[in-house]
Regions:
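Beta-to-alpha transition at the N-cap of a short helix in the ABC ATPase nucleotide-binding domain
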Residues: 86, 92, 101-103
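Conserved ABC transporter NBD signature motif
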Residues: 71-82
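Short helical segment in ABC ATPase nucleotide-binding domains corresponding to the A-loop/adjacent helical element
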Residues: 103-111, 121
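Conserved coupling/switch loops of ABC nucleotide-binding domains, chiefly the family-specific signature
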Residues: 69-72, 119
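Helix-to-loop junction immediately C-terminal to a conserved catalytic motif
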Residues: 63
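Conserved structural motif at the start of ABC-family nucleotide-binding domains
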Residues: 11, 30-32
């Protein structure tokens, strides 16, 4: 008999809130409230909704670019405390760095992982 390993959680949001302050004001904007879900390794998920509903905010928190105001975000069962070199995503809008060539934009992720320039070229 072969035992199957339990599916590994790729990303998990547990009771996540995100608030943004308005410049020059004490008012806050609630971008995400009590978000709880998990995605298993190999699972495909689509986050859809109208403009301004918090889709990009979730991606930013999942990648560690933005910290949640409350709750926990985990990637590969580890709490996200800052930018994660193993996480990348592409937004709907093309956000290439215009001062870099197409190849240099593609190589950027490898550079962040410490891959030598000679390896990037191959």
């Amino acid at each position: 008999m072969t035992l199957m390993a339990a599916p590994r959680t790729a990303i998990e949001f547990i009771g996540v809130d995100k608030r943004f302050g308005k410049p020059g004001s004490t008012a806050e904007v609630l971008a995400a409230r009590d978000v709880t879900f998990s995605v298993t390794t190999g699972e495909v998920v689509s986050i859809i909704g109208p403009s301004g509903c918090g889709k990009s905010t979730l991606l930013n928190m999942g990648s560690g670019l933005t910290k949640p105001s409350a709750g926990i975000v985990k990637v590969a069962d580890e709490v996200v405390n800052g930018p994660n070199k193993h996480v990348a995503f592409m937004l709907q809008k093309d956000l290439l760095m215009p001062w870099r060539t197409i190849a240099q934009n593609i190589e950027f992720g490898l550079e962040l992982r410490g891959v030598a320039a000679s390896e990037c070229q191959s």
